[in-house]
Design a protein with these regions (language model features):
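Substrate-access "cap/lid" subdomains that shape
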Residues: 172, 206, 211, 215-326, ...
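Short loop/turn segments at secondary-structure transitions that flank enzyme active sites
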Residues: 33-34, 48, 57, 92, ...
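C-terminal subdomain of alpha/beta-hydrolase-fold enzymes, centered on the catalytic histidine
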Residues: 197, 279-491
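Serine-hydrolase-like catalytic core of hydrolytic proteins
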Residues: 73-244, 287-310
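A broad, structural surface signal
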Residues: 165-168, 172-175, 193, 230-233, ...
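Acidic/polar residues in short coil/turn loops that connect beta-strands
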Residues: 13, 162, 180, 276-277
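A structural signal for the main folded, soluble domain(s) of proteins
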Residues: 25, 61-76, 118, 124-125, ...
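Non-catalytic accessory segments of hydrolases
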Residues: 1-157, 181, 266, 336, ...
């Protein structure tokens, strides 16, 4: 432990030298695992070993290997398999036990990096400790090579196991940074939110966090075991390998090329995604639905126009802007009768298709998860309506109100920093999130999600609305994991 505002911290692993960032202390690129490289590739990550001397923690670590696209290019992150690091922001490493929030980034389990999310202002405003983590992505983190090769050495869902290991690191070491290991909120957006929903069903992960925030995603993009095996065999065919050792010997570029080839073969899908493995996770979606969620407070919600973001993705947009292709997806997933009922609940217009796409992929899975949790445990639900002039309240837009994401603003928003009513909304949003992290409940004006399905709608003026998607929710019924993008192949 250090004193005052010193940025040198002593942990049981060794000393770390951080820096001052936005009035708080920050430690960047802190390893929580040994590098998963060479003979450790495709193996469960091992806890980081102790070091001698003072370790520099003033620079972000590398992002995990991925195809760097779009706005991520402006950040120019280094890519490396040695990427299992986390970033920490704290008002002070002074022995005070502050609430902790651990952030899991989104990116369809294929893209993203902890370095996109700067937690200094949240730490300063809320007197909390903010942790953002990296985890293995795509082919390196979410392909069922173990069963496909019949090799028990290869664990399932390596990317999720990385997240669990990071949570263990927080439990064991965050007190040295001014954090309370007994008050940890696990939070995420998109694939990060789906990760949170999965870890709420994991016996290994449950004891490691005490509150949960899910932004746009729950139990969707998740494969069953059969699908995960089919995907893994496609990878092995493309790579021409038959053993773990051959996989470990390949250049990472070859693995990334195989990922691109598999994705071309399975368009409009997320082939490299978590699966129900019966080990870290339940064995099936049915088992996950039937299992009780942990007795912790939950804050969850979605954005009104989620699918507008994906209209920028060629291929995905072709599905979500075609009523015929959406119908084919629904028929394949749920049968002709259910497909007809769902389609009848949405106008035959571009607006109707956008609502259907948003509900299918994000809103209904998140809403139904919240309903199930709220039956037993404290739950608060939101819909984010404040949108971009061109793209509406698209997927991920709320992140710009919560986080300091200056590196992405020029590309994503084109309008410069938050100002006026948008700045006021950002302050309200952060206040609710911070209070939830601190106390397990948001602001008093936010009514709990109950039988009325009370929902806080964030907009220029926030308002409580009962069951704002009532008609569509009733049509979707018990389908608490809508097809989402994982079910679009062949549409």
């Amino acid at each position: 432990m250090s004193t005052g505002t010193s940025t040198r911290v002593r942990t049981s692993l060794g000393e770390l030298q951080g820096l001052r960032d936005g009035g708080v202390s920050a430690w960047l690129g802190v390893p929580y695992a040994q590098p998963p490289v060479d003979a450790q590739r495709f193996m469960p990550a091992a806890p980081v070993q102790a070091w001698h001397g003072v370790r520099d923690a003033t620079q972000f670590g590398a992002a995990c290997p991925q195809k760097v696209v779009g706005s991520m290019k402006s950040l120019g992150p280094a890519l490396s398999e040695d990427c299992l690091t986390l970033n920490i922001w704290s008002p002070a490493a002074d022995g005070k036990k502050r609430p902790v929030v651990v952030w899991v980034h989104g990116g369809a389990f294929l893209l993203g990096s902890a370095r996109v999310y700067t937690g200094a202002h949240l730490a300063a405003q809320g007197d909390i400790v903010v942790v953002a983590l990296n985890y293995r992505l795509g082919v390196l983190g979410f392909v069922n090579f173990g069963e496909a090769l019949g090799d028990e050495r290869i664990a399932s869902n390596l990317g999720l196991r990385d997240q669990v290991l990071a949570l263990r690191w927080v439990r064991d070491h965050i007190e040295a940074f001014g954090g309370d290991p007994g008050r940890v909120t696990l939070a995420g957006e998109s694939a990060g939110s789906m990760s949170v929903s999965l870890l709420m069903h994991s016996q290994e992960a449950r004891p490691l966090f005490h509150r949960a925030i899910m932004q746009s995603g729950a139990l969707s993009l998740i494969h069953d075991r059969e699908t995960s095996l089919q995907v893994a065999k496609l990878y092995l065919d493309h790579l021409g390998v038959k053993t773990l050792e051959q996989l470990q010997a390949l250049p990472v570029e070859s693995l990334q090329a195989a990922q691109e080839a598999v994705h071309r073969q399975l368009p409009q899908t997320i082939p490299s995604a978590p699966w129900y493995d019966g080990a870290l996770l339940p064995a099936s979606l049915t088992e996950a639905r039937q299992a009780p969620t942990p007795p912790i407070p939950l804050l969850a919600g979605y954005n009104r126009d989620e699918i507008r973001f994906f209209e920028l993705w060629r291929g995905v947009a072709d599905v979500f802007l075609s009523r015929e292709r959406m119908q084919a997806v629904l028929q394949r997933q749920h049968g002709d009768g259910f497909a007809a009922q769902v389609l009848a609940a949405y106008p035959e217009s571009k607006y109707g298709l956008r609502r259907l796409g948003t509900h299918m992929s994000f809103a209904m899975p998140t809403l139904h998860f919240a309903q199930r949790h709220a039956a037993q445990h404290p739950t608060w639900f939101y819909r984010f309506d404040r949108g971009h002039p061109m793209l509406g309240a698209m997927h991920a837009i709320e992140l710009f109100y919560l986080w300091d994401m200056k590196g992405l603003l020029p590309t994503m928003l084109r309008g410069g920093p938050l100002w006026g009513s948008r700045r006021a909304l950002a302050q309200r949003l952060r206040r609710h999130w911070i209070r939830f992290v601190r106390e397990g409940r948001p602001g008093d004006e936010w009514e709990p999600f109950d039988a009325r399905r009370a929902t806080l709608v964030f907009d220029q003026r926030d308002r409580m609305v009962d069951d704002p998607e009532g008609r569509q929710r009733e049509v979707w019924g018990a389908q608490d994991s809508a097809p989402g993008m994982a079910g679009l192949g062949g549409a």
